[in-house]
């Protein structure tokens, strides 16, 4: 999990496409706010339309991480689009390309 690894000072940045940590925290009974507070490096969340409120603008992630978190929302996408989206759909292909380009730019900025 990107956020767990991001608590290690050896990591310089983290990118989460359609972040699923809110659901995972719920399933393993871990406090999401505590998980976020442990993060030691900048983060980029690329959120789909049906991802939870905590990974969107104004959500818990932004409240806890502040300027250390960038969020880009993809209102036309559903959770999982970047790894299992139908690339024959031009809208999905467009947003997958955009997401991966944003991720590369973000990582290059901090590496």
Where do the PLM segments sit?
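Ligand-binding pocket scaffold of soluble enzyme catalytic domains
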Residues: 4, 13, 44-47, 56
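N-terminal Rossmann-fold cofactor-binding loop
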Residues: 18, 47-49
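Conserved loop-alpha-helix segment in the C-terminal half of the alpha/beta-hydrolase fold
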Residues: 58-68
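C-terminal catalytic histidine-bearing segment of alpha/beta-hydrolase fold enzymes
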Residues: 66-111
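A short helix->loop->beta-strand "cap" motif at the edges of active sites that frequently abuts
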Residues: 11, 40-43, 66-68
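Short beta-strand/loop motif that positions the catalytic acidic residue
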Residues: 38-40, 44-47, 74
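Primarily recognizes the serine-hydrolase "nucleophile elbow" in alpha/beta-hydrolase
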Residues: 1-32, 38
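Conserved alpha/beta-hydrolase "acid-adjacent" motif
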Residues: 52-58
């Amino acid at each position: 999990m990107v956020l767990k690894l991001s608590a290690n000072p050896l990591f310089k940045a983290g990118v989460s496409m359609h972040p699923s940590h809110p659901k995972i925290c719920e399933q393993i009974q871990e406090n999401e706010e505590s998980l976020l507070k442990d993060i030691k490096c900048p983060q980029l969340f690329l959120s789909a339309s049906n991802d939870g409120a905590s990974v969107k603008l104004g959500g818990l992630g932004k409240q806890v991480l502040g300027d250390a978190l960038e969020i880009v929302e993809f209102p036309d996408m559903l959770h999982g689009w970047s790894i299992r989206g139908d690339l024959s759909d031009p809208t999905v292909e467009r947003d997958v390309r955009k997401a991966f380009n944003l991720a590369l730019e973000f990582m290059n900025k901090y590496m």
